[in-house]
Amino acid sequence: MKLAGEDPSVEDLMLVENFAERENNMIRRFASVSRREFLQAGTVGIVGATSVRANGVAAVGQPERGRLDQPVASVKALVFDVFGTVVDWRTSVTREVQDLAMRKGLTVDAAKFADAWRAGYGPTMNRVRNGELPWTKLDALHRMILEKILIDFGITGLSEAETDTLNRVWHRLQPWPDAVGGLTRLKNRFIIAPLSNGNISLMTDLAKHSGLPWDCILGAELVRHYKPDREVYQSAADFLDLKVAEVMMVAAHLGDLRAAKGVGLRTALVTRPLEYGPHGTPDLKPDSSADVAAKDFNDLAERLGA
């Protein structure tokens, strides 16, 4: 595993090529499908439309729940950041690392391991964004980071199957307690979909594992750009045949909201005080990047009149 600024290693490039070959086969298969057909097809889990509804949603009056005012009166779809906003990645990864350590007789600080894995996410993803690596699925990026931190933490003796199973912990993350119920409420009034940097198979597995009631799956893989690239946010409106102002980005991270707002999406901050653990520093106070602020998805549903 090479650090940012260094040439990719042979191992990195081989891993990327294996993922890229499967990716290219899938893209060729769907190259002739229009956006609307793509959304409605529901094939191979790419964009699996179920009951998509948009009932002319009205907007949020921030001081008073349920009051629907400008500037979000035209919102018809909500798209969600997933890691940290919908699912509790830190607790989930920590528990699986603890279980693995117990089975293998390892001594490891599982919470620090989870934090280190997540800390590698941005820098490794930026190697794709800045052209150092070709387009690479998040599963492959997670594997690159994992192989490095296994060495950093002195963990050896894992089989290929054990390493692969650990890498796929990101497919098995647990939702926040309010997530499924809150999303179900919001679905009654809006189109709801993830807009994540996670690849489509990852998002599909998460939805099935946790019962996330998405209408369809959107995200970085469909446009081969990672957030905060504007192409990802624009694609949400394009795939849903909506104007950007008819789409609201929901996230626990102000940086995500700033990027979305820069493209013209409406925005909602949902705070997750424990995303980074009891001593973390999450975004808890909205700024001008947030049109709406809520303490969880049920609170957001009330504020949006769902």
What do these predicted ranges mean?
Residues 160-209, 217-220:
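Substrate-recognition element of Asp-dependent hydrolases with the DxDx(T/V) motif
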